[in-house]
């Protein structure tokens, strides 16, 4: 039995009146498979699914809000390193596209990296760092931003002197990174 299934079973063993599932990562998504369909449930995050009640983050608005300040700083465009898109249009990548469109900027192709694959994000940073026209990057989450910064530094680009990079989620470890 895998650990997610075991943890769900343990939680259900106390006979809860309902469950709250945080659908932000693979474990949260996998947990949905093991929860009985008749169990009252609230799903937080993720995308629109079958749950009776859901709390959906303003992912698209967030992507726009992260991109606009970079454009306000005078960057001609903002490149994006993101995750695979969900089944709805409520994505950070679409918010990034919205911001660029609002300013009349043609969106460059985003670099999509697999979830939780930091090495691919480092490679994306190297790839973007080798381009002379990259001055701003919106990373889809903080982990991706840190990995992109590493890739940029590996090819001699300075952050923020040469390239502005923003992440998303405001994870507490972000303050530990320089």
Tell where the protein language model's regions lie, with residue ranges.
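Bacterial carbohydrate/catabolite-sensing allosteric modules
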Residues: 1, 5-13, 17-18, 29-178
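Beta-alpha junction/loop-to-helix N-cap segments that form part of ligand/metal-binding clefts
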Residues: 24-27
């Amino acid at each position: 039995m895998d650990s997610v299934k075991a943890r769900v079973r343990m939680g259900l063993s106390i006979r809860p009146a309902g469950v709250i599932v945080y659908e932000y990562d693979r474990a949260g998504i996998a947990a949905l498979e093991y929860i009985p369909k008749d169990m009252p449930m609230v799903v937080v995050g993720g995308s629109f699914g079958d749950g009776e009640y859901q709390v959906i983050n303003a992912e698209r608005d967030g992507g726009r809000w992260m991109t606009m300040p970079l454009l306000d700083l005078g960057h001609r465009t903002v490149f994006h390193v993101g995750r695979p898109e969900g089944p709805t249009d409520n994505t950070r990548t679409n918010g990034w596209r919205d911001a660029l469109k609002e300013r009349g900027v043609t969106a460059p192709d985003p670099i999509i990296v697999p979830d939780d694959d930091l090495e691919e994000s480092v490679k994306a940073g190297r790839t973007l760092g080798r381009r002379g026209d990259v001055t701003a990057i919106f990373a889809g989450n903080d982990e991706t931003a840190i990995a992109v910064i590493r890739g940029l530094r590996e090819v001699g680009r300075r952050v923020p002197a040469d390239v502005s990079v923003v992440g998303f989620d405001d994870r507490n470890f972000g303050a530990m990174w320089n």
